[in-house]
Regions:
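ABC transporter nucleotide-binding domains
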Residues: 1-134
Length: 134
């Protein structure tokens, strides 16, 4: 079973005069322990897909079709549940590291801090977990 399964995900933005189709029929499967990177040109929909996965699409955008399953949980059927998993089980780092990451800390330190916060682990255990993606 996939840890994260995105099936036929489409995201639209309803503008005044037209509909902008930001992502269309996206299909992704991620197994437990895997890390996914979305790569593409500016404006290709990477951030839109990432935001849709963790249910952070702002108006006038909306997920127009498809599903995002985190284990057995369809996060768009019960959006309140994603709050429990966002940052703990699934998260994203946006393409501009200056606004997404703390430039004073290493990426490793930031991962360790996040793991410690969500899983209540010691620094050593959090470091081991961040290195081995478990």
């Amino acid at each position: 079973m996939s840890f994260l399964k995105i099936k036929d995900l489409s995201v639209d933005y309803q503008m005044r005069k037209e509909t902008v189709y930001a992502a269309k029929n996206v299909n992704i499967e991620v197994n437990k322990g895997e890390i996914l990177g979305l790569v593409g040109e500016s404006g290709s929909g990477k951030s839109t897909v990432g935001n849709a996965i963790i249910n952070l699409i702002d108006e006038p955008g909306k997920v127009s079709s498809g599903s995002v399953l985190l284990g057995n949980l369809n996060i768009h059927e019960d959006p309140k549940n994603i709050v429990k998993y966002r940052g703990k089980k699934v998260g994203l780092i946006f393409q501009d590291p200056q606004t997404s990451l703390n430039p004073i800390l290493t990426i490793g330190e930031q991962l360790i801090e996040t793991i410690q916060t969500h899983l209540k682990l010691t620094k050593e255990d959090a470091k081991e977990r961040s290195i081995n993606c478990r």
